[in-house]
C-alpha cells in the first residue's frame, strides 16, 4: 500500500494551547444506509492519511465512526493523540442545561474520552426530545446564545472537548456570540464551495481569529439539477490545464484561502484524490476566473418552511 499522505495542519489563532487541526477532514453527513460501509471507509481513510473526522449527533454516524477509530487504534494504524474528532450539538439540545448531557452522550456513542472540537450545529433551538428533519418551525424556541455558549465553555473547562466553535453562523450571529463569549469560538463550519464563496464571512473570520471549515466543498448534498461546481465549464478548463480533477481544483482553491474542509467520499480513489492538492498551485488567472463564477447558496436551512432571517441577508 502507498504511504499515507501527511496532511498540513492549521493552528487555532484563539487557542492558548496552540491546538492544531488537519486542513482536510472526512465528513460523515448522512447519505448512507450501511453502517459497515461507513466503518470500512473510515478505516481506509486512516490508512490513506486522514486524521480529522467530522460527525454530529444528528448524522447518525457517531457510532460507526467510534467503532472504526477504536479498531484503527487497536490495529496500530493511529493513536488517539494523532486524531482530530469533531462533533456537533443538535438543536433539540441547544439549551443551556442540555449541552453537557448531549456532549457526554456523543462521547459515549463515539467511545471517546474527549472531543477535539465541539460545535453548535445551527443557531437555532427547538423542543427538547422532539427530533425531526426538517425541523418544524412551530417547534422552534428562543435561542439563548449566551447561556448555551457558557455551557459550551464549561464543556471545554471540564476537558470533555479541547475546543469549541459553531456551524452555520452568519457574520451577524458571530458578532452577537463574540459580544458575550469568554472563550472565543475557534471555528465556524459553513457551506462553502466555488459556487458559494462567502467572501464577507471569510474576511470577518480572518479578522477575528476564527477558522472557517467548509462543508459541501464540492457542492454535493441537497442539490437538485446540475452541480454548479462539478459540472462547471470554467472549472473543467482550469482542471484540464493543471492535469487535475475539478474536485482537486475546488479543494485547492479553499486551501489557498486558508479554509479547512470536510469533503465526504467513501470511494477509495476519490478519497485519495482529495488529498493530492498540496504540491501544486492555482495561477492568478485561475483565481480571476473562479471569482467570476455565479454565486448561490445550496443549503438554505434545516427548517420547514425556511426561515427568512436565518442568514441575515448575508452574501
Swiss-Prot record:
Q: For NADP(+), which residues are the binding ones?
A: 216-274
- Determine if NADP is one of this entry's keywords: yes
Q: In which pathway does it act?
A: Phytoalexin biosynthesis; glyceollin biosynthesis
Reaction(s) the record says it catalyses: 4-coumaroyl-CoA + 3 malonyl-CoA + NADPH + 4 H(+) = isoliquiritigenin + 3 CO2 + NADP(+) + 4 CoA + H2O
Q: Which domain of life is it from?
A: Eukaryota
Q: How does it assemble?
A: Monomer.
Protein name per Swiss-Prot or TrEMBL: NAD(P)H-dependent 6'-deoxychalcone synthase
Amino acid at each position: 500500500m502507498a504511504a499515507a499522505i501527511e496532511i498540513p495542519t492549521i493552528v487555532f489563532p484563539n487557542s492558548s494551547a496552540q491546538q492544531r487541526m488537519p486542513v482536510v477532514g472526512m465528513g460523515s453527513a448522512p447519505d448512507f444506509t450501511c453502517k459497515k460501509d461507513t466503518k470500512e471507509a473510515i478505516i481506509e481513510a486512516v490508512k490513506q492519511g486522514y486524521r480529522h473526522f467530522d460527525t454530529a449527533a444528528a448524522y447518525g454516524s457517531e457510532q460507526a465512526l467510534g467503532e472504526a477509530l477504536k479498531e484503527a487504534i487497536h490495529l496500530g494504524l493511529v493513536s488517539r493523540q494523532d486524531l482530530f474528532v469533531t462533533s456537533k450539538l443538535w438543536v433539540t439540545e441547544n439549551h443551556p442545561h442540555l449541552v453537557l448531557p448531549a456532549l457526554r452522550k456523543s462521547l459515549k456513542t463515539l467511545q471517546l474520552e474527549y472531543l477535539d472540537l465541539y460545535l453548535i450545529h445551527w443557531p437555532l433551538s427547538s423542543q427538547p426530545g422532539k427530533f425531526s428533519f426538517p425541523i418544524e418551525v412551530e417547534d422552534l424556541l428562543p435561542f439563548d446564545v449566551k447561556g448555551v455558549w457558557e455551557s459550551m465553555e464549561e464543556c471545554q473547562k471540564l476537558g470533555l472537548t479541547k475546543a469549541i466553535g459553531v456551524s452555520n453562523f452568519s457574520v451577524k450571529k458571530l458578532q452577537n456570540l463574540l459580544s458575550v463569549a469568554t472563550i472565543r469560538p475557534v471555528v465556524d463550519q459553513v457551506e462553502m464551495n466555488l459556487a458559494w464563496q462567502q467572501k464577507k464571512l471569510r474576511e470577518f473570520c480572518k479578522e477575528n481569529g476564527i477558522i472557517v471549515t467548509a462543508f459541501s466543498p464540492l457542492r454535493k448534498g441537497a442539490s437538485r439539477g446540475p452541480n454548479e461546481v462539478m459540472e462547471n465549464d470554467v472549472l473543467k478548463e482550469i482542471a484540464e490545464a493543471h492535469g487535475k480533477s475539478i474536485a482537486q481544483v475546488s479543494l485547492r482553491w479553499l486551501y489557498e484561502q486558508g479554509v479547512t474542509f470536510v469533503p465526504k467520499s467513501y470511494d477509495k480513489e476519490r478519497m485519495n484524490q482529495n488529498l493530492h492538492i498540496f504540491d501544486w498551485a492555482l495561477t492568478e488567472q485561475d483565481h480571476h476566473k473562479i471569482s467570476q463564477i455565479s454565486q448561490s447558496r445550496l443549503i438554505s436551512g434545516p427548517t420547514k418552511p425556511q426561515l427568512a432571517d436565518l442568514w441575515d441577508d448575508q452574501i
